[in-house]
UniProtKB/Swiss-Prot annotation:
Pfam families: GHMP_kinases_N (PF00288). The keyword Kinase applies. The gene is ispE. It catalyses: 4-CDP-2-C-methyl-D-erythritol + ATP = 4-CDP-2-C-methyl-D-erythritol 2-phosphate + ADP + H(+). Belongs to the GHMP kinase family. IspE subfamily. Catalyzes the phosphorylation of the position 2 hydroxy group of 4-diphosphocytidyl-2C-methyl-D-erythritol. This is 4-diphosphocytidyl-2-C-methyl-D-erythritol kinase. One of its GO terms (molecular function) is ATP binding.
Length: 274
């Protein structure tokens, strides 16, 4: 048995910070899936022993796919799944063709983890509910549930793990991503550098706006509260951002930007530049 699936990045059309609660910030955001050439391809098959292969930039125990499998095992034990089902996770050979950059605000690691949880549930016919998958996803990473949901567009609230489908004209094939090479943003560092400028009371209003309305009405600073702290913490990013025209927007905590595609013939899809 070999199961192969594709995983696509997300962008944050808007990301507004409400307040800090405990160690983390409460946010509201609109996440949209972007389907173009930038994608990870994951293959899962049965083998004699467990393996996880891919061009990863972290130790195994910090890998989001490995974390997802550990969370899944614990969950299946709690749900009284059979010993053979749980042991079957120890004989999976997982291979990832990694193309979505990490530390870019595109949800690369979360996309892989969310995709794996969703597809394993389908492959093995465990019939876990979306709510159960979300419980696991929130333990792996804040963006993971968006990728579990398989939604094209969704509102994310709380710490980013509460996902609600947003019905709108899909932008999945209308967005173009620019992911600068060799420029990485630490989510932790960017959030630590965030300084609240004004009290934010318009959460519900933002959650009603269509993504297209947001992109055509506001600039990248107005849409993403993490742009300024990201520029403060990363001089290389600041140099790049200063040269970008207003049509480019900032995703997550960076370092990637995105824009509505030029609909003329010959328009590029995905940029990865120096």
């Amino acid at each position: 048995m070999t199961h192969v699936f594709e995983v696509y990045p997300k962008v944050n059309v808007f990301l507004k910070i409400l307040h800090k609660e405990g160690a983390y910030h409460k946010i509201i955001s609109r996440m949209c899936l972007v389907k173009n050439k930038l994608k990870d391809i994951i293959s899962v098959k049965n083998a004699l022993s467990f393996s996880l292969k891919g061009d990863f930039d972290c130790p195994l125990e910090e890998n989001s796919l490995f974390k997802a499998l550990q969370v899944l095992k614990k969950f299946l034990v709690q749900k009284n799944f059979s010993h053979s089902v749980i042991k079957s996770l120890d004989t999976l050979a997982i291979e990832v063709e990694k193309n979505i950059p990490t530390q870019a605000g595109l949800g690369g690691g979360s996309a892989d983890a969310g995709g794996l949880l969703y597809h394993l549930n389908q492959m093995f016919d465990w019939r876990l509910s979306l709510k159960e998958l979300y419980t696991m996803g929130s333990l792996v990473g804040a963006d993971t549930n968006f990728f579990i949901s398989q939604y094209k567009s969704a509102n994310a609230t709380s710490y980013g793990e509460v996902i609600e489908n947003f019905e709108e004209e899909s932008l999945e094939d209308r967005l173009e991503i620019y992911a600068p090479n060799h420029v990485f943003c630490s989510t932790k560092a960017v959030y630590q550098a965030y300084k609240p400028e004004t009290c934010f009371f318009q959460a519900k209003e933002w959650l009603k706006k269509t993504s297209l309305e947001c992109l055509k009405t506001y600039d990248r600073n107005e849409l993403n509260d993490l742009l300024k702290p990201a520029l403060r913490t990363n001089p290389a990013l600041k140099d790049i951002e200063s040269q970008l025209s207003k049509e480019w927007f900032f995703s997550g905590s960076g370092s990637a930007f995105f824009r509505l595609k030029n609909t003329q013939k010959g328009a590029n899809e995905t940029h990865c530049q120096q």
